[in-house]
Regions:
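Long, low-complexity, charge-biased intrinsically disordered regions
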Residues: 1-149
């Protein structure tokens, strides 16, 4: 008995259907098209901030465009990357320092970094540590956030 796993990913008006059986994919799309007006964009290239690259062994997901958009949004396109992770012993104070002027920017940037941990898991510790200061971020915490962009 052949077991197959058909994946149908739906987000708002984007649908991605995949399976190893091309005929099954075509049938599902045909069935969906009876109820909904579908427009095929061909093979998956970009979905929810992820670029998809098909290889001989499977599918590789990256977030290169998402990272670049984040660099542009935070005016960090001219800086060199900092490969050093945040030390577990590094102390960030929740009460000391100048309050960061744009708490919304801090929160949005931290959300974007959280999303990036899906494809860049080695920043997870640092991002989670810096997420502790969402309520009232300071300038020094913001500068620490900029290391990971």
């Amino acid at each position: 008995m052949l077991i197959t796993l058909l994946l149908v990913l739906i987000y708002v008006d984007d649908i991605f259907v995949t399976d190893s059986d091309v005929k099954l994919i075509a049938q599902v799309i045909q069935d969906l098209n009876v109820q909904f007006s579908l427009k095929s964009l061909g093979s998956l290239q970009y979905f929810l901030g992820f670029e998809a690259h098909r290889t001989a062994t499977g599918l590789t997901l990256t977030q290169t465009k998402y990272v670049w958009d984040l660099l542009v949004k935070t005016n960090m396109t001219i800086f060199k990357p900092c490969p050093t992770p945040l030390s577990p012993n590094y102390k960030l104070s929740a009460t000391e320092g100048i309050i960061f002027a744009d708490a919304t920017l801090y929160k949005c940037t931290m959300g974007a970094l959280q999303y990036l941990t899906l494809t860049i898991p080695n920043i997870s510790f640092s991002v989670n540590k810096l997420s502790q200061f969402l309520a009232s971020p300071t300038q020094s915490q913001w500068e620490s956030v900029l290391r990971y962009i």
